[in-house]
Curated annotation (Swiss-Prot):
Record GO cellular component, one term: membrane
Similarity section: Belongs to the drug/metabolite transporter (DMT) superfamily. Plant drug/metabolite exporter (P-DME) (TC 2.A.7.4) family.
Locations listed in the record: Membrane
Organism: Arabidopsis thaliana
Domain EamA: 9-135, 186-313
Taxonomic classification: Eukaryota, Viridiplantae, Streptophyta, Embryophyta, Tracheophyta
Sequence intervals crossing the membrane: 2-22, 29-49, 55-75, 94-114, 125-145, 173-193, 205-225, 244-264, 270-290, 294-314
Name recorded for this polypeptide: WAT1-related protein At4g30420
Pfam families per UniProt: EamA
Alphabetized GO MF terms: transmembrane transporter activity
Keywords: Membrane, Repeat, Transmembrane, Transmembrane helix
InterPro entries in the cross-refs: EamA_dom (IPR000620), WAT1-related (IPR030184)
Amino acid sequence: MAMTMIQLCYAGVTLFARATLVHGLSPRVFILYRQAFATIFIFPFLYLSRRKSKIAISSLDLKSFSLIFLVSLIGITINQNLYLEGLYLTSSSMGSAVGNIIPAITFLISFLAGYEKLNLRDIRGLAKIAGTILCVAGAISMTLLRGPKILNSESALPIAKSVLGHLKDQNTWLIGCLFLFSSTLCWSFWLILQVPISAYYPDNLSLSAWMCLFGTIQCAVVTFFLEKDPNAWILHSYSEFATCLYAGIGASALSFTVQAWAIAKRGPVFSALFNPLCTVIVTILAALFFHEEIYTGSLIGGLGVILGLYTVLWGKAKDVMMNQDQRDNDQKSEVKIHIEDSSNTTICNKDLKNPLLSKHKSTEEIQTHQQLY
């Protein structure tokens, strides 16, 4: 349920961010304010929660500082800048659809890193490979095979705010997709890096707070060097302010905390498997309310991505059941050992130095008991 709510937040950010960027807000400024609002929200919440529970905020040593700084650089600064540039140059539907290859990429990297197991002699192991290939092929077809237009008409794209400047229209789609693919790689690495970081720094709320703070500092440096126009730093409408605030609180502060918790419990691939839900929501709402065009190639590729994704999910289902059986067996073994240890424990001490009742008390109590009955 928590991961489903996160995908709803991401879908809202994708739609509203696309609309805000098209109307003139710089992608880099949007990311900066998003992370700043997330930091402003999460640190007081962290302080109040720790004060109420009387638990100190986890401090940072050199290793944890380096790991969190690296994760913030990959998962926030680089990832979000690439994603919003790609989102600006393509569409909301494309931005969410390309994210469907994140589970396949995450599974592949997790396998190479030793977090996922793969048995080529098992049909489920082969399903993981086939599903991964199908996901990648579907994503490529979405990019290269646009085909006939199914829904809505094409709208002009003002690209003066793009970091690339003015481009020909036929180049914007391909370059935007390249940005989106690069963003998915960064996000997959971010999910996988959560495993060693969570093991070394298990405080998920503090981890999210530090990531938001480091991301804000990094994004401020990037925006300072790339955004030369001082007017670009100003939020000119309530809709821009509301979008940045919503993205910061919902899609950064809260989602980072929940995802860190989910990854610690179920692993990075489990967290990545919920991305197709965001695609379905965004595609429907973008076509209905924002009149974004839908192409045949994108539709076929999207279906291929989702089919490949759930092929991988079916392949992973056996691993989940095996892990659950292993945990159940471990728990049964612990209970059995506990019972055996308890049976060897002396329950009653027979060698008392002094009797519990004296002879007089025992005789008097027996007589009283007989009189009552």
